[in-house]
Amino acid sequence: MNENEYISRLKARDIRPTALRLLILRTMAGFDRAFSLADLEEELDTVDKSTLFRTLTLFLAHHLVHGIDD
């Protein structure tokens, strides 16, 4: 998927595309299996954990991703 497709996905869900949101979405799309928050934290070790959590919460609220409570 190219950058414009990621931007379109965010805009389609009324999410403003920022560099960090695009980075997180690209990283999520790169997984070939289900992944956890810990997996994302490991992959995105330069991103603050609270920022990552807030972004995932935003994605969940706008139905860009779905979550599973464990």
Predicted regions and their residues:
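Short helix-capping/hinge SLiMs at alpha-helix to coil transitions
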Residues: I15, A29-D32
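Basic amphipathic alpha-helical segments that dock to polyanions
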Residues: L52-H63
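Short coil turns linking two alpha-helices in DNA-binding domains
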Residues: V47-D48
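Short alpha-helical segments that sit at the start of domains
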Residues: M1-L25
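Short, Lys/Arg-rich nucleic-acid/phosphate-binding segment
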Residues: D69-D70
